[in-house]
Amino acid sequence: MNVQIKICGLTDPDRAAECFELGADAVGLVFYPPSPRFVIDDLALEICQALPKSAPKVGVFVNDTYEFIMNKAERCGITMAQLHGHESQELADRLEKAGIGVIKAFFANRSPDFKAMTEYSAQACLVECAGEKLPGGNAKAWAWRTARGISERMPLALAGGLDPENVSQAILDAMPDALDVSSGVEASPGVKDMDKVKRFIQNATQTGIDYQPRKVFS
């Protein structure tokens, strides 16, 4: 199995569908109003309806309640929640009990907080560079190699500064189970450049690196 790929911050149903045609494993929809990639419920529903029924559809949330997240799942078709704030373990447990897979985001400055990650129980953790107010799409690369210790402990989704040119090196450095890319495949915030998406997926799946990634998006 190749490393899984999530294209995050989709705002257009046709481009979301094309991402899957090109080989993406999941898409991400941002429900955080300050983000330039924020989607309202009606658009999120359109995007989810344009995708294969079995496709993982990941909602990105920041410090939202259980009720808010479940409302988006019911109204828009979200099947997983990516938590980018200070969400409690109790919230993650409630979501998973309700059938919503949880990915917990952590932020790396000089190095990731291994202790916090190993103490938090979720389907997987996502690690990207800290330093911005918005969740994801910050185009900030970091020392991906430091994440290899995480992937030895739990499923890891790698994010932060990924693009078609550096994705092969990122995989070699971190040996992640999944990749999460947003700004690195965009023409402008929220507008995906489908040529970049195609090259990103090709380069990520043709590295020739021999390891066995675990499934993060399902």
UniProtKB/Swiss-Prot annotation:
GO biological process: L-tryptophan biosynthetic process
Pathway: Amino-acid biosynthesis; L-tryptophan biosynthesis; L-tryptophan from chorismate: step 3/5
Top enzyme class: isomerase
GO molecular function, one term: phosphoribosylanthranilate isomerase activity
Record key words, sorted: Amino-acid biosynthesis, Aromatic amino acid biosynthesis, Isomerase, Tryptophan biosynthesis
Any Pfam family: PRAI
Listed InterPro entries: Aldolase_TIM, PRAI_dom, RibuloseP-bd_barrel, TrpF_fam
Record EC number: 5.3.1.24
CDD domains xrefs: PRAI (cd00405)
Reactions mediated catalytically: N-(5-phospho-beta-D-ribosyl)anthranilate = 1-(2-carboxyphenylamino)-1-deoxy-D-ribulose 5-phosphate
Chain coiled-coil ranges: none
Family: Belongs to the TrpF family.
HAMAP family (UniProt xref): PRAI
Protein name: N-(5'-phosphoribosyl)anthranilate isomerase
Organism whose genome encodes this protein: Desulfatibacillum aliphaticivorans
Gene for this chain: trpF
